[in-house]
């Protein structure tokens, strides 16, 4: 009988976030059902569609939250004063193109994620609300978040380049669930 380190073994009902946390510390995660290890999970398994959809769902939820908080903080598109003229022009052009195609949308829906994040996270209270301690941390997180988002969207490797971001997202998700 093979012995496993206790912190490598999770119960069958554990969350995907629990699996990610184990794989942050170990090469393998073992799943136990009825007292027996029945499954081995490795980091490479995190490339599979189910995990990628889970992560993309979290990415999408985060983007929606940032847009919602931006719209609440700056009603009537007053957030546009926070953007450069060039970036705002690109957002307007995208909105106009979407409308031409019959897709009704708000201007904020056409602003790039990094721009929305930068607008919102320039506000010290928002930085703290999202659990960051400095603007430098925010900028790094935005860059890593975008990398993960882009790699997910374009079916690129996420384990090699985005593992730290995946682990942080899993921890954050667990804290949200625990708080609820």
Report the location of each language-model feature:
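Amphipathic alpha-helical interface elements
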Residues: 13-28, 36-180
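Bateman (tandem CBS) regulatory domains
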Residues: 1-8, 42-45
């Amino acid at each position: 009988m093979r012995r496993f380190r206790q912190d490598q073994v999770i119960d069958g009902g554990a969350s995907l976030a629990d699996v990610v946390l184990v794989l942050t510390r170990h090469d393998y995660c073992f799943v136990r059902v009825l007292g027996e290890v029945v499954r081995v999970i490795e980091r490479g398994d995190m490339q599979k569609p189910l995990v990628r959809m889970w992560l993309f769902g979290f990415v999408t939820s985060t983007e929606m939250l940032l847009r919602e908080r931006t719209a609440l903080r700056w009603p009537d598109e007053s957030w546009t004063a926070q953007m450069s003229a060039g970036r705002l022009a690109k957002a307007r052009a995208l909105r106009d193109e979407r409308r031409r195609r019959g897709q009704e949308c708000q201007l904020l829906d056409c602003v790039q994620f990094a721009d929305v994040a930068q607008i919102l996270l320039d506000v010290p209270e928002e930085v703290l609300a999202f659990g960051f301690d400095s603007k430098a941390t925010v900028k790094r997180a935005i860059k890593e978040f975008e990398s993960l988002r882009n790699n997910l969207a374009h079916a690129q490797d996420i384990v090699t380049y985005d593992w730290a971001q995946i682990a942080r997202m899993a921890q954050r998700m667990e804290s949200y669930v625990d708080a609820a």
